[in-house]
């Protein structure tokens, strides 16, 4: 497959690792244990940090989490903060599957994602025009297509990721 800098790059192309991890049966109990190493940044409830430095992971589709970690490991998503934690020498494919199931089953803290609320009508208009087709009517995403849940995600995180996608900095989305 073409590298991320290539115009032929496909954001959701299958990778051998992603495909292999998706075939594994994740165990939420083992995922809970493995998540201990993630809590420093993403917090015990998976809510991340309100300033958007660390995203909410609670309630995210397991397939999306697996894709993102696989992309980081393959160098298809730049995320220097995650490199030390997502490396192949740190976390196994089975642990990724376990973590993904555990996080998917966590309750989404919906109040997380609220921005200032100053332009709600315009935000809704933009969402319906540009985002709804993939992320759904209520930000629920689509696990089968690797479209993430955006409902409840931190407002500053969303702004940063949207800007990075538009600038071509984040090309795996």
Protein language model regions, located:
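Electrostatic cytochrome c docking/interface patches
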Residues: 3-35, 50-53, 104-126
